[in-house]
UniProtKB/Swiss-Prot annotation:
The keyword tRNA processing does not apply. It comes from Thermomicrobium roseum (strain ATCC 27502 / DSM 5159 / P-2). Mn(2+) 4 binds at E838, N840. Its cofactor is Mg(2+); Mn(2+). Residues 936-1078 are annotated as: Allosteric domain. This is Carbamoyl phosphate synthase large chain. Mg(2+) 3 binds at Q826, E838. Residues 936-1078 form the MGS-like domain. GO terms for molecular function: ATP binding; carbamoyl-phosphate synthase (ammonia) activity; carbamoyl-phosphate synthase (glutamine-hydrolyzing) activity; metal ion binding. Mn(2+) 2 binds at E298, N300. Mn(2+) 1 binds at Q284, E298. The gene is carB.
Amino acid sequence: MARQPLVSSVLVIGSGPIVIGQAAEFDYSGSQALRALREEGIRTIIVNSNPATIMTDEDMADAVYIEPLTVEVLERIIARERPEGLLATLGGQTGLNLAVALAEAGVLDRYGVRLLGTPLEAIRRAEDRQLFKELLLEIGEPVLESLTAYSVEDALRFAEEVPPPLIVRPAFTLGGTGGGIAFSEDELVTLVQRGIAASPIGQVLVERSLLGWKEIEYEVMRDANDTCITICNIENLDPMGVHTGDSIVVAPSQTLSDRDYQMLRSAALKIIRALGIVGGCNIQFALDPRSDQYYVIEVNPRVSRSSALASKATGYPIARIAAKLAIGRTLDEIPNPVTGKTMASFEPALDYCVVKIPRWPFDKFRHGDRRLGSQMKATGEVMAIDRCFEAALQKAVRGLETDQTDLTWEDSRWQDPSALEQALRIPTDQRLWAVAAALRRGWTPEHVSALSGIDTWFVRAIQRLVEMEQRLASEPLTAELLWEAKRLGFADRTIAALRTTTEQEIRAQRLALGLAPVYKLVDTCAAEFAAETPYFYATYEDENEAPPLDSPKAVVIGAGPIRIGQGIEFDYCSVKAAQALHRAGVAAIMLNNNPETVSTDFDASDRLYVTPLDAESVLDVLRHEASSQYDQLPPVIVQFGGQTAINLAADLAAAGVPILGTDQDAIDLAEDRRRFERFLHELGIPQPPGAGVTTLEEALETAERIGYPVLVRPSYVLGGRAMEVVYRREHLEQYLATSGAFASGRPVLIDKYLDGIELEVDALCDGHEVLVPGIMQHIERAGVHSGDSFAVYPAVELPSVHVDTLVRYTTEIALALAARGLINIQFVLHQGVVYVLEVNPRASRTVPFLSKVTGVPMVDVATQILLGRSLGDQGYRGGLWPRQPLVAVKAPVFSMAKLQGVDVQLGPEMKSTGEAMGIDRTFEAALAKAFLAAGLAIERGAPVLLSLADNDKSAGVELARGLLALGHPLVATEGTARYLRAHGVPVELTVAHIGHGHPDVLEVILERKVRGVINTPGRDEGTIQDGFLIRRAAVERGIPCLTSLDTARALVRALLGGGTSFSVQPLPAYRTREAVLA
C-alpha cells in the first residue's frame, strides 16, 4: 500500500516571465508537477507572475496567484494559504533563488513550511561556486583551476597564475547571465564587473578555459532511498565555450566510447548522491577529445531546459516524477505513465536520434552580436527525431522557420576562404552552414573539425549530406535516389531547388512512387514494452507504428519555436484548443516541434506528432491520418498557432485540407493592403492613409503623398519584424535598401504614422454575433509595438462614446470577414477619431491575459464555435462582456542584457521576450505590481538619471517633479538639467555628454551611482549614438531603463497614487465585488 505523502498542501513557485535562459520549459514542468501533486490528493497553490502560462489557469491548482515573484509577496501568500510544503525546483533559477531567500529571511521557519525535494543545503552547494568546488574535491572528482572572486582584484590575481582565456561564471544566475569568456585582462575586468552585478550574492567563478573540449550532459534522478538513474545523456555538437542553450545538441551521445559513457555516468551518479538532491538534476561535463580526462563544469539542482529536452527526447516525464519524489514517493513505486507497465526506476532507452537546434533572435536584431559564448542568446529551440543523425539535423533546420530552410544556404562573404575559415573558428548561429559550405569546397572533414572544434563524426555526417546534394543536382532522380535522399531528411523543397524544378513536381513524383513517411513511437523503452502514449515522429522506413485514429478528429497546428513576436501565448492557445476538442468528443491531434512546451507533452493531446511545421511535413501527417472512415483529410485549426500556422493556411487550402474557422480568403484579405483598404472603405471605417507598394518609386511617392512620418512594414509577419517609423525621405530609402523588405515578393505596407492612443480588442465571432470580452488600452502611444507596450484592462480612461465605437467597428469587421472563432483588432485614437491599424483573424498574444482577467475562456469558446456551436449555445451573447471590478496591466519583459549590440529603445519592431501581469482593484496598484513583476521598479529613494530628447523636455518637467516627490534625487545630462532648472526643478548632479567632461553620463551608470535611467532617443546622429551607449550601459549593469516618457509617467503615477500598498489574492477573488485584503 502506498505511503501517505509527506505533506497535504504544497506551494509551487513558477519561473515568472519568459526571458532568454528561462523559457517555456518551466510552464511545461510546472504544469506536469501540479497534475502529479493533484493525483496524490494534495492541495496545490501556484504563484507565478506570467499570465501567458498554462500553469496559471484556474483549473490547474486549488489556488492560483498571478502576483510579483518577491519574498514579500510570497510571505503574504504563505501567511494566507498556510501550505505545508514548498516546491521550488520546478520554477527555474527564479524558483531556486526565491526558496533560498525565503529560508534566509526566516519565512519558512516562521510558518512551518517544509522545503520539498532537494534540501536547501544541496541547492547552496550546487549553486555557490566555492561550495560546489569544495564538494567535488571531497568526493575526488576532477576540478578545473579556478577562483571564487568577489572583486576585480581577486580575478586579476588569478589571471597572473592562469593566463586568459578564462571563463567567468556568476553564481545563482540563469542562462549564463553576466558571464562570458575573457581573452584578455581588459575583457576579464569587464566580465567580472558585469558578473558580480548579475549575481545575487556578488560572486563569480573564474576558471581556466576548456575551449574545444566536448561538452556532455547527463540528466539524472534520485529519490530519498538513494536510488539513482540516468534518464538521458546529451552531447553538444558545439565544443566547450558555447552555452549549452546556444549549442546544437544530440541525444543520445553519438561520439562517446562505451568506456567514456560509463565513466561520466558513474561520475554523475556519484555527484547527485553527494549533493543529496531529491528529484531531477542536470550535470555538465567537459571531456578532452584526445584522452579520457574530464572535468565537472556545473550542476543544475533543478528541472532545467535540458530536462525538458531529455523528457521529450525519451518520453520519460521528468518533472512529473520529480514532483512525486519531492513528496516522498520513491522511483520503484511510481508507474511510468508512458508504458503503463514499467516503473519510474526503469532507465529509458532510445532507438532513434534526437537533435535540438536553438532559435536565435538575430532575424529581429540585424545589428546584434552573433558570436556565441558562455552567455545564452537563443530565445527558443526546435527538436527533431529520426532514425539517423543526418535526417534529424535536416528536420531541425527546417523547423527553425528562418530564411535558411536547409543547409544549402551560404553567406556571400564565404567566397573568400579566409572569411569562411573565420566563420568556422568563431562560433555564431551560422557556423553549421559554414561547415557545409567548407565541405562543398572540398575541405576535408579533418580540417573543418580542427578549425571548428566540432567532432569529425558530425562533420562526416554533414559531408554525407553535401555528397547527396551533389547527386541530387547531377544524377537522374530514380526511385532509389529519392528514397535515399528522403532517408537522409531532404525536404521536397530542397530537392526541387537542387534540380531547378518545383516542390509540387517533386511531391507528385514521390507520391506516385508510393514514397511517404511512416510514423514511429516514442516509448522510453526502445520498443521493449508496448507503450500507451500516442507520441510519434516521421521516418522513411517500412513499418508503421501509428495506425490512423478511427474517430472524429481535428488537427491543431502548434506555434513552433519560441521567438520574439511568437511566444508562449500561442502554445497556451494550442493546448487549450486541444483540451476543448477532447472534451467535445473530438480527438485532438497536435503538430509541433518545440521541446520546451506543454503542447509537446505526451498527454496534452490525444495524439502528438513531433514534426517540422512546413507544408510537406504537415500534409504528410494529414494524408497519413486520412485513411479513416470518418473523413478524407482531417480538418485543421490554424488560428491558435500564431503566424507559423497562419502562413501554412494557403498551402493546406490549396491541397484541399478543410480549415476550421476563418477561411483562407479572409486571412488573405486582412494581409493584402489593397483589398483590406477597399474592405474598410466599403464598411465606412477609417484607417490611416497608406498603401501597399512593391517598388522604391511607389514607396517614395506614397510617403510624399500621405506625409512623413510614416510606418513601414512587410506583410505576413509577426512581432513587427522589420517594422520602422520613418521621418525623412533618405531614411526611407536607407530602410528599403537594407531591410530586404521587397525580397519576399509581397507588398511593403506604408501608413501615415498617427501619434495617438493605441487600443486593442480580442473578439469571438460565430458568424452571427460578436462577443468582445474586453478592450485594452496601451500606455505607450502608437508607434511602439503592441507586444512591447504596457496594456491595461479595462481601458480605464476611454470615454464611453469611443468604447461604443470600438465595439461597433469590431462587430462590423468580424461579421463582414465571416470570421469564425478569434479575431484581434488594433486601433488608434487620434484627435478624437478611431482608426483601424490592423486586423488579425487569429488568436493574439493577449488572449491568455484577457481570458484570465475577464473570466471568459476565450480559446474554449472559439474552439466550440469551430465545431459548430454558436455563442448562444454556449451561454454567451454578442456585445461587450461586463467589465470586471479590477484593473490588470500586462507588462513587457525584455532580455536585452543577453544581446550585445541591441538597442533597448522601443519602436514598432517587437523586442520583448515575455510578459508579466499586475492585477488589483485600482489602476495605480495594478501598475505598481506590473512594474515590480517586470523587474522595472526603481529602488526607493535612489538617484534617477534623466537624458531627454529636445521634443520631450517640456513633458519631462512634470515627470521630474513626480520623481522628486517620491524622494528620488535627480541626475541629468547638460541640456536636460538646464531645461529642468529653468522650470524650477532642482537637479542634484549634472553630467557631461560621453567623453566631454567628468563625470560623464556613462560613468555614473557604470559606477552604479544611479539606479534608474530615463532616456528618450533624439534624432540626430550624435544623440542617437550617445543614447544607444547610455541604454546599453544601463541594461548591462542591471539598472531599469525606460525609453518612453509614457512608461515613465505611468511608473511615477503608480507610485504617487499609493500603488505600493497593493493586495495579494487568488486570481478569481479579483473578479468578485467584495475586496478581500491579504
